[in-house]
Amino acid sequence: MKRLFFALFATLWLSACGAEPIWAPDEAVAKARYEHVGPTSVTLYTVLSTRSGTGAHAGLLINGSERVLFDPAGTWRHPKLPERNDVHFGITPKMVDFYIDYHARETYDVVEQTIMVSPEVADLIMARAKAYGA
């Protein structure tokens, strides 16, 4: 399961190539910071076509010292959430629901896969997502 998860994660990294850089100010990122009370985890969201079963998009919710969403090459935005190069900050449960609702429709399903990880692993994945850039 871990190999499959990390293989999918590697696909996310590669799919971000070519996006335009976005860099929210430090104050906006600090203000939006959200720490989820649940266990440290990483959740892969895969958007699948209901017609063919093929993958159309993927995003990674990282719940570590804070909760962020890595959404490479995505079009999802929220005016109250700052973004830095495909990393969205301030991901509350309501924003997770909004993200899923944005992608799910009659022609697309959203599949969620979560694994619990140590705080160190969650923060390492988060640091790599933040460092990756658009």
Predicted regions and their residues:
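Alpha-helical transmembrane signal-anchor/signal-peptide segments
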Residues: 26-29
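C-terminal motif of bacterial Sec signal peptides marking the signal peptidase cleavage site
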Residues: 15-16
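Glycine-rich catalytic cores of cysteine/serine-nucleophile enzymes that process amide/ester linkages
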Residues: 19, 23-24, 35-111
